[in-house]
């Protein structure tokens, strides 16, 4: 690799410092799917909520739009990642920012993507509470798992974006600091 395509060690260190906490947030949000599953299992055993399908029959048709919203959330994760991490868009948004501010912006954007990935499992939990359809919860939890897989914060992807930004905004990388 040439000097222009490689990120120096100080920038990689700073990138790791940003990605570490992001991955903790990612793990916690993915872990929330398990927490919701435990809640559903406990409620099933206790038998208090939901009241049953007969009470939900009048609005049973709502299941399908909520499934569609779960699928839309997966698509939104893909679109958001592409738009928020598009190198040209990052370069435009980097106007007037230094490297730590840029990394903070990217980090905040990544958390937004995670939040969208959690939408399907929350919809599934709501459907289970209202109608008692366990399958609804499982399907929508599965969609959340897919959305989270699509949202994983890849160090390689972040490096590629920063290399591209460095090409057009080298002043951001002039003195990154040695300790991050």
Each PLM stretch: what is its role?
Residues 2, 90-94, 141-180:
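Short terminal or interdomain "cap/linker" segment that borders an active site or interface and mediates
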Residues 78-100:
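Membrane-helix interface/capping segments
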Residues 23-31, 107-118:
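Select subsegments of transmembrane alpha-helices in polytopic membrane proteins
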Residues 67-83, 144-152:
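Hydrophobic alpha-helical membrane-embedded segments
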Residues 115-136:
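Alpha-helical transmembrane segments and their membrane-interface junctions
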């Amino acid at each position: 690799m040439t000097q222009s395509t490689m990120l120096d060690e100080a920038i990689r260190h700073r990138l790791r410092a940003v990605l570490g906490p992001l991955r903790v947030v990612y793990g916690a949000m993915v872990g929330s799917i398990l927490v919701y599953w435990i809640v559903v299992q406990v409620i099933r055993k206790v038998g208090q909520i939901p009241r049953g399908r007969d009470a939900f029959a009048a609005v049973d048709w709502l299941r399908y739009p909520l499934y569609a919203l779960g699928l839309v959330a997966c698509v939104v994760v893909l679109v958001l990642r592409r738009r928020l991490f598009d190198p040209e868009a990052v370069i435009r948004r980097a106007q007037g920012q230094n490297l730590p501010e840029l990394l903070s912006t990217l980090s905040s954007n990544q958390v937004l993507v995670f939040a969208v990935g959690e939408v399907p499992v929350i919809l599934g939990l709501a459907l289970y509470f209202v109608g008692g359809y366990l399958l609804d919860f499982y399907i929508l939890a599965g969609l959340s798992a897919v959305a989270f897989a699509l949202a994983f914060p890849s160090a390689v992807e972040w490096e590629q974006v920063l290399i591209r930004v460095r090409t057009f905004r080298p002043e951001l990388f002039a003195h990154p600091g040695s300790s991050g």
